[in-house]
């Protein structure tokens, strides 16, 4: 009987006494098989069917070459490489060294290699390793690797083999529940898939430009039509599309489309995404499709969960992208324009995610420590690009395109990374005992921010038609970016002006006794006004009906610094028209940005809890000002003696935007009546009467708010070493870092 089964299991195989391959039973037990036909000795002893797998097995081993020719070949290759080093060194002696050369950038460009195979890529930045790793990376090495399996079969094997180390590592990252069940039953019905993809195309794709939408549309519907045979990478992409689409829907829409609550749908699709990422072997992937799916998932995840886990996954994806060479521009390796453009889009979206998540966790972006030559994406529409192109399409700067918003954010990322690297270099110089040198060149922070302002105003804002929702969003984001850079720069000046223990330090530019308070109040008033405008535009993004489909994304971009500064000022300023405007803006964004504390880790809560406390105290101050106008007036007189012009209303800078309306809020009307704060007036001593002084904003808050101050937010604002005694006061003289002007 066993012999018959053995014969049936090997149709067409020549009868021989010794088989080519190990039987399945011996291979599973990891024991040596004598490969006897029809049954090996191990199977006879175990009384099991002896089944030999079909096929010819692995490719025959290459005959070993003698050692002498191998050594000679390697020696010749080494001599050639050393010769290239010598030529490069001689060339460097004749030409001045640039900043990029000093970072090792040119070395990497000369000696790196990029292996691209269909939708996969692998990057090696050292030529010494290329030949040695070629066999390991791109040739079969296992016993049964005489043929190259398809992506689908290899992914399925990795997902179903319990002994796969890659699966164990992926399951450790995404949780061991990620290997619990098949994915087929998590796909939506055809009708639901149609609606979800429409929601994705309208709500998500314009903000996360990592795809070529005509190509993605074809891939999506081909996969939906054949779910039973779709490969793991494409299946992962399907689930991330569905997950991000659900993220962009409000609860009522989700209930109508999926017949389940938004919370239930998010839990189901997030589980499916995590399971697909684990089974698709994300940690070792070389697939662009898999990386696109992971980046899309991380772009949507902060709307539901912005814990430290999401930040850690961002770091993981960043390094996966580097192993695939996305930090190198495709033109260096002769890639086609279509592939080069998609690689650029994907890399810069990773940098955007990295910048946002690092800011929320009060850390520097990962990209700041790496050199990249990947150019920003082209300013084109998707219809201008096709896989068959041999030359890149011409950019369109006469009107806005699909990539306008992405490029606005790329401009900000580039400037932020340059400023961060400059700050590190200045700090390192200071630690060495030398004085930071500030030159009036293009390498100063002042000039970098001026150039950013000029690019946004001259290239992007003029082509944005604010009557078009997507262009309205792009214009608003550009103006928020300028306001944020202005706040960082001005706060650096304030930090350098502060007095330590009542005395000015020698390495800070000390204001004269006659102008100390006046200068501090003037800068603080400018900070207050700019913070209000940032919150005003942010409130418009959260409440405007014209861009309601993008509200899900705006909710995740909390302007921590501006909000904290406005709330702290409301706790100390007297009642005025400007404060009423600030209160309206704060109320709008506070409700829109409200954090679900049950889904956040301590790092995020370390930012949100002070905001909650500041909001409660600001409400208390407002109530006290309304019920005891005498106390409010006294406080106002104390401040106004310092600078009578401080609270004079200034004209609005965003007059073309509609004023945020409570009735437009997607998730219902905002609370217009602040809740009462437990405790009496004595429980918050001096809340409505503490005047502003020249000792600095956080010092005033220390006395007003007690132990919980703006500390977490101050860590997010760098102190620039270039604001020093010699250049600090003059570096911003005549420098307009304000928000964009409109004709």
Swiss-Prot record:
Record's GO cellular component terms: nucleus
Keywords: DNA-binding, Metal-binding, Nucleus, Transcription, Transcription regulation, Zinc
Gene Ontology MF term list: DNA binding; DNA-binding transcription factor activity, RNA polymerase II-specific; zinc ion binding
DNA-binding in keyword set: yes
Sequence ranges of Polar residues compositional bias: 624-635
Superkingdom to which the source organism belongs: Eukaryota
Intracellular or extracellular location(s): Nucleus
SMART domains: Fungal_trans (SM00906), GAL4 (SM00066)
Keyword hit for Metal-binding: yes
Induction of synthesis: Expression is repressed by glutamine and at alkaline ambient pH and highly induced under nitrogen starvation and acidic pH conditions.
Deletion phenotype: Leads to decreased production of bikaverin.
DNA-binding region, residue range(s): 23-50
BP GO terms, sorted: DNA-templated transcription
Chief place where the protein resides: nucleus
PANTHER family named among the record's database cross-references: UNCHARACTERIZED TRANSCRIPTIONAL REGULATORY PROTEIN, ZN(II)2CYS6 TRANSCRIPTION FACTOR (EUROFUNG)
Known function: Transcription factor that regulates the expression of the gene cluster that mediates the biosynthesis of bikaverin, a red pigment also considered as a mycotoxin.
Protein name stated in the entry: Bikaverin cluster transcription factor bik5
Organism annotation: Gibberella fujikuroi (strain CBS 195.34 / IMI 58289 / NRRL A-6831)
Upper classification of the organism: Eukaryota, Fungi, Dikarya, Ascomycota, Pezizomycotina
């Amino acid at each position: 009987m066993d012999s018959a089964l053995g014969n049936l299991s090997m149709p067409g195989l020549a009868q021989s006494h010794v088989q080519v391959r190990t039987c399945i039973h011996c291979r599973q037990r990891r024991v040596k098989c004598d490969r006897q036909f029809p049954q090996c000795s191990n199977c006879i002893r175990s009384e099991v069917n002896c089944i030999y797998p079909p096929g010819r097995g692995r490719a025959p081993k290459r005959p070993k070459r003698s050692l002498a020719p191998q050594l000679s070949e390697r020696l010749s290759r080494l001599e050639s490489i050393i010769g290239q080093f010598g030529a490069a060194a001689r060339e460097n002696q004749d030409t001045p060294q640039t900043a990029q050369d000093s970072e090792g950038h040119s070395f990497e460009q000369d000696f790196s290699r990029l292996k691209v195979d269909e939708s996969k890529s692998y990057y090696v930045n050292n030529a010494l390793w290329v030949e040695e790793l070629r066999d390991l990376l791109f040739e079969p090495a296992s016993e049964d690797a005489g043929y190259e399996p398809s992506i689908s079969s290899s992914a399925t094997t990795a997902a179903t083999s319990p002994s796969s180390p890659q699966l164990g590592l992926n399951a450790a990252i995404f949780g061991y529940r990620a290997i619990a069940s098949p994915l087929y039953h998590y796909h939506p019905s055809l009708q639901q898939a149609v609606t979800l993809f429409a929601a994705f195309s309208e709500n998500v794709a314009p903000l996360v430009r990592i795809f070529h939408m005509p190509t993605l549309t074809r891939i999506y519907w081909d996969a939906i039509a054949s779910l039973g045979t779709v490969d793991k990478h494409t299946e992962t992409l399907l689930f991330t599309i569905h997950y991000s689409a659900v993220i962009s829907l409000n609860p009522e829409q989700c209930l109508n489309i999926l017949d389940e609550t938004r919370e239930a749908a998010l839990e189901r699709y997030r589980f499916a995404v995590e399971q697909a990422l684990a089974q698709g072997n994300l940690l070792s992937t070389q697939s662009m499709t898999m990386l696109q799916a992971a980046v899309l998932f991380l772009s949507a995840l902060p709307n539901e969960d912005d814990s430290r886990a999401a930040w850690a996954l961002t770091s993981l994806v960043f390094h996966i992208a580097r192993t695939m060479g996305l930090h190198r521009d495709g033109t260096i390796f002769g890639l086609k324009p279509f592939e080069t453009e998609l690689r650029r889009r994907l890399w810069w979206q990773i940098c955007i995610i990295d910048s946002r998540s690092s800011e929320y966790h009060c850390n520097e972006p990962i990209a700041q420590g790496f050199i990249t030559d990947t150019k920003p994406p082209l300013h084109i529409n998707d219809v201008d690009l096709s896989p068959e192109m041999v030359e890149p399409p011409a950019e369109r700067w006469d009107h806005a395109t699909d990539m306008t918003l992405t490029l606005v954010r790329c401009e900000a990322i580039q400037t932020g990374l340059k400023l961060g690297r400059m700050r590190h270099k200045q700090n390192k110089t200071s630690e060495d005992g030398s004085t930071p040198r500030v030159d009036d060149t293009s390498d100063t922070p002042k000039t970098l921010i001026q150039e950013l302002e000029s690019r946004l105003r001259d290239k992007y804002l003029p082509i944005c038609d604010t009557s078009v929702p997507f262009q309205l969003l792009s214009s608003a984001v550009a103006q928020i970016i300028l306001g944020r850079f202005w706040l960082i720069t001005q706060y650096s000046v304030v930090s350098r002006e502060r007095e330590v223990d009542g005395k000015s330090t020698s390495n800070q530019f000390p204001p004269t006794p006659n102008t100390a308070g006046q200068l501090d109040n003037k800068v603080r008033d400018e900070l207050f006004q700019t913070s209000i405008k940032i919150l005003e535009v942010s409130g418009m993004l959260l409440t405007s009906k014209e861009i309601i489909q993008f509200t899900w994304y705006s909710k995740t971009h909390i302007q921590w610094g501006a909000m904290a500064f406005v709330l702290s000022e409301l706790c100390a300023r007297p009642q005025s028209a400007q404060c009423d405007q600030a209160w309206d803006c704060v109320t709008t964004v506070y409700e829109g940005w409200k954090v679900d504390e049950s889904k956040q880790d301590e790092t995020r809560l370390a930012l949100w809890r002070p905001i909650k406390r500041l909001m409660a105290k600001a409400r208390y101050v407002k109530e006290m000002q309304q019920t005891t106008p005498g106390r409010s007036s006294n406080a106002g007189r104390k401040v106004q003696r310092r600078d009578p012009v401080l609270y004079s209303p200034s004209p609005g800078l965003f007059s073309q935007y509609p004023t945020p309306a409570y009735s437009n809020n997607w998730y219902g009307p905002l609370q217009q009546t602040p809740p009462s704060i437990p405790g009496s007036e004595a429980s918050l001593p001096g809340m409505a009467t503490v005047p502003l002084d020249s000792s600095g904003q956080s010092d005033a808050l220390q006395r007003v708010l007690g132990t919980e101050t703006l500390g977490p937010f101050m860590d997010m604002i760098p102190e620039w070493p270039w604001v020093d005694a010699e250049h600090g006061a003059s570096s911003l003289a005549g420098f307009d870092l304000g928000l964009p002007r409109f004709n």
